[in-house]
């Protein structure tokens, strides 16, 4: 197939641009579990695009909804005006999210959703007369998008180091990565719940009267798939309740079925005060995100506001009509095909298959929870990430798209994946691992 255009103008995100142009990995179509490369090769998608295409690619239900909406109402401002589908989608999201989290603020991405949660937390405390509660607490190795709020509370050094001074008044508690104790764990690891107590050290230093919120990914994804230790999130909730600190779950990856439930909050039985979500809310077809907040937060903002506008925050495309239509169609698919429950069942098969690779000479750890898994390969001396990157490129040429972060190969297949799809994914991965030096 003829190259569609030259590759010089587009600056690709989170990509080794110079290397990509030497050996491009271009897709031109997608359907179901597969992409189609520009050379006509079928590429099995083991990453749901980028953790987002939960119902599989090219769903006619969603493309039809988008087309019909674009032909009816292409855009409507969300500042001081509304349209029905944004209200309908908000209600549908609230219905499947944890009880009590029933108000939805729409954004355009996970990064915007996270920054919105932080601003809402600060505004909430100010509205109830506790304006000194301004400190934000993140976690080492945490990923919360690429907005200045998100990289400030995030704990991935490469995402922070080039951008100078970030938000002030931010602290980070310890990560939960304990390979010496939890290597090759299946599901939530046994060791590490005590690490939630490092939050108490920060509270002792700054006093709870100065701390607004704590944000955490229930399952850390971009840092290499780190499921939380057993009881860790429950302990985090208890500490936040004790000190009147808001707990935020960043569910941009885990929201909408990734763990076999609508949310990780439901899966773990721990309800935060705010959830950020995005990606699968529209099946990845149209950019959209949301901050889903508790009734207590919303009611406080409504009751205590001293101006007609209760929250001076929003985006031009918040609740966009076409994105709302896509979201409603995606939620219909998740419900009608029972995809959340299907993912929970497939997760057990995935766990069994991925751990069969533990004896490969290059594999130093395997982690999994729900329909998410990671294989960590040993780094090359003096070249951290090189072996993982090579694995990603080899997999592509063998017909597999996978996500790589450092030397960790991450897997999050669409929720429609059947057992034979899982088999094929890891047959290719096994072949790739054998070729790594």
Where do the language-model regions lie?
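Conserved N-terminal phosphate-binding loop of PLP-dependent enzymes in the Aspartate aminotransferase
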Residues: 1-437
């Amino acid at each position: 197939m003829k190259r569609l255009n030259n590759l010089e103008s587009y600056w690709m995100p989170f990509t080794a641009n110079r290397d990509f142009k030497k050996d491009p990995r271009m897709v031109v179509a997608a359907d179901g579990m597969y992409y189609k490369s520009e050379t006509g090769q079928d590429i099995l998608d083991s990453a749901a695009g980028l953790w987002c295409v939960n119902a599989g690619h090219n769903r006619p239900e969603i493309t039809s909804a988008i087309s019909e909406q674009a032909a009816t109402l292409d855009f409507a401002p969300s500042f001081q005006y509304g349209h029905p589908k944004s209200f309908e989608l908000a209600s549908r999201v609230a219905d499947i999210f944890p009880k009590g989290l029933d108000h939805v603020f729409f954004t355009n991405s996970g990064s915007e959703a996270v920054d919105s949660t932080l601003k809402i937390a600060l505004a909430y405390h100010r509205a109830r007369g506790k304006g000194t509660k301004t400190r934000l607490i993140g976690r080492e190795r945490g990923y919360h998008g690429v907005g200045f709020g998100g990289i400030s509370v995030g704990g991935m050094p490469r995402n922070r180091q080039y951008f100078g001074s970030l938000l002030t008044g931010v602290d980070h508690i310890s990560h939960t990565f304990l390979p010496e104790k939890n290597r090759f764990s299946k599901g939530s690891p046994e060791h590490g719940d005590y690490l939630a107590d490092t939050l108490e050290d920060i509270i002792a230093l700054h006093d709870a009267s100065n701390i607004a919120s704590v944000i955490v990914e229930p399952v850390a994804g971009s840092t290499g798939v780190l499921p939380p230790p057993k009881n860790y999130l429950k302990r985090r909730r208890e500490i936040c309740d004790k000190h009147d600190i808001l707990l935020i779950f960043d569910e941009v990856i885990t929201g909408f079925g990734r763990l076999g439930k609508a949310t990780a909050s439901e899966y773990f039985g721990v309800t935060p005060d705010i959830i950020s979500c995005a990606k699968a809310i529209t099946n990845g077809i149209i950019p959209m995100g949301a901050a889903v907040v508790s009734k207590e937060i919303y009611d406080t903002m409504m009751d205590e506001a001293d101006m007609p506008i209760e929250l001076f925050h929003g985006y031009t495309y918040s609740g966009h009509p076409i994105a709302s239509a896509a979201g409603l169609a995606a939620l219909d698919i998740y419900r009608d095909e029972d995809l959340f429950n299907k993912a929970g069942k497939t997760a057990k098969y995935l766990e069994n298959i991925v751990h069969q690779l533990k004896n490969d000479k290059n594999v130093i750890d395997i982690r999994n929870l729900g329909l998410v898994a990671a294989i960590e390969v040993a780094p090359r001396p003096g070249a951290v990430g090189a072996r993982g990157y090579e694995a990603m490129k080899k997999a592509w040429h063998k017909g597999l798209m996978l996500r790589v972060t450092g030397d960790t190969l991450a897997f999050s297949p669409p929720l429609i994946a059947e057992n034979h799809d899982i088999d094929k994914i890891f047959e290719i991965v096994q072949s790739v691992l054998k070729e790594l030096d």
